[in-house]
Amino acid sequence: MSVDEKSDNGEKPEIKGVKLPDLIDTLPEGVDPSNFGLLMDVSMQLTVELGRTERKIKDILGMSEGTIITLDKLAGEPVDILVNGKIVAKGEVVVIDENFGVRITEIIKTKNE
């Protein structure tokens, strides 16, 4: 749904900002943030996962152009944001010009936090 569209009850959706914790405030005790400069140019893989499904090999081999794959998430449900394969946040899919994007709506806290 775009910002200009109305929700099911006929009202424009309310858009709220998300307050994310400052990374420096979440560092474990004894970690010196001045050493982070060495890591700033390290690349990490960021993946946005719309959903998952499981299929038998025969079904996968039978796929062709036009095959529709149903995923385990509903349309409009938050998507998972992973860094190097580990879920770190949830977000909502947005369209920016002609590209897809993701607006972060929740940062997943680790067990240590």
Curated annotation (Swiss-Prot):
Organism equals Borreliella burgdorferi (strain ATCC 35210 / DSM 4680 / CIP 102532 / B31) (Borrelia burgdorferi)
Function, in words: FliN is one of three proteins (FliG, FliN, FliM) that form the rotor-mounted switch complex (C ring), located at the base of the basal body. This complex interacts with the CheY and CheZ chemotaxis proteins, in addition to contacting components of the motor that determine the direction of flagellar rotation.
GO CC, sorted alphabetically, is:
bacterial-type flagellum basal body; plasma membrane
Bilayer topology: Peripheral membrane protein
Protein name, entry field: Flagellar motor switch protein FliN
Can the keyword Cell inner membrane be found in this entry's annotation? yes
Q: Which GO terms describe its molecular function?
A: cytoskeletal motor activity
Domain of life the protein comes from: Bacteria
> Which keywords does this chain's UniProt record carry?
Bacterial flagellum, Cell inner membrane, Cell membrane, Chemotaxis, Flagellar rotation, Membrane
Q: Which Gene3D superfamilies does this entry report, sorted A to Z?
A: SpoA-like
Show which residues constitute the signal peptide.
none
Q: Which family does it belong to?
A: Belongs to the FliN/MopA/SpaO family.
An annotated GO BP:
chemotaxis
Q: Which NCBIfam families does the UniProt record give?
A: fliN (TIGR02480)
Q: Where in the cell is it found?
A: Cell inner membrane; Bacterial flagellum basal body
Give a single Pfam family match: FliMN_C
